Amino acid sequence: MHTVQKDTTFTKIFVGGLPYHTTDASLRKYFEVFGDIDEAVVITDRQTAKSRGYGFVTMSDRAAAERACKDPNPIIDGRKANVNLAYLGAKPRNLQSAFTIGVQQLHPAFIQRPFGLTPQYIYPPTIVQPSMVIPTPIPSLQSPYIDYNAATQAYTHYTTAAYEQYPYAASPATGYMGYGYTSPVQQPLSTTTGAPPTAYIQYQPQQLQPDRMQ
């Protein structure tokens, strides 16, 4: 007959931050005050037989495991340990400090733009020939997480199909600036350094006033 394995999801505890001299006996001694223990094991180095800094304790019931994990700063063998249910992993030491460090290390160029929208193209109301397209060295920024300066050198030239534009520009006589939007098709980043991509600005012809044509 096969022995039914006991579910230890809510009873098995991960214990981190243990000193080198911690043993199975000392680990069990700390946790036995919270309830009955099925197993207490310190993971040791094969060569030195010393603690590798972590171990596992399996309590007999869920309530005992919850009591053992309640203390946010447990001291085991004279050292502050990290105790949490094994399936959840180690507890973060300090959520506030971890958040502060993460914000300080975040470069402003990597901050995501609202809604992840790509930059828009402006169509100024200048009197030029219809459908005239003038290339200008304006970098195209597709990914909100890519460094703006490095992107101009990392991107390869995009095909004209990737720049499908929708002329939603208003009439120049209204005095409003029209906007076009790029296609959501994105090309993969190139590992080699290339020339900055060329964006295109399209100028709409301006309608002449009837009194000026006389």
UniProtKB/Swiss-Prot annotation:
Keyword list, A-Z: Cytoplasm, Developmental protein, Differentiation, mRNA processing, mRNA splicing, Nucleus, RNA-binding
MF-aspect GO terms: mRNA 3'-UTR binding
Protein's job: RNA-binding protein that specifically bind the 3'-UTR of VegT transcripts, leading to maintain their stability and stimulate their translation, thereby playing a role in germ layer formation. VegT is a localized maternal determinant essentially required for endoderm formation. Also has some proneural function in the open neural plate and in the context of retinogenesis. May also act as a mRNA splicing factor. May play a role in myogenic differentiation.
Native source organism of the sequence: Xenopus laevis
Primary location group: cytoplasm
Tissue-specific expression: Strongly expressed in the nervous system. Expressed at early neurula stages of development.
Listed SMART domains: RRM (SM00360)
Pfam families, alphabetized: RRM_1
InterPro entries for this protein: Nucleotide-bd_a/b_plait_sf, RBD_domain_sf, RNA-binding_reg, RRM_dom
GO biological process: cell differentiation; mRNA processing; regulation of RNA splicing; RNA splicing
Domain of life of the organism encoding this protein: Eukaryota
Name of encoding gene: rbm38
Family matches, as CDD domains: RRM_RBM24_RBM38_like
Family: Belongs to the RBM38 family.
Subcellular localization: Cytoplasm, Cytosol; Nucleus
Protein name per Swiss-Prot or TrEMBL: RNA-binding protein 38
Domain RRM residue range list: 11-88
This protein's GO CC annotations: cytosol; nucleus
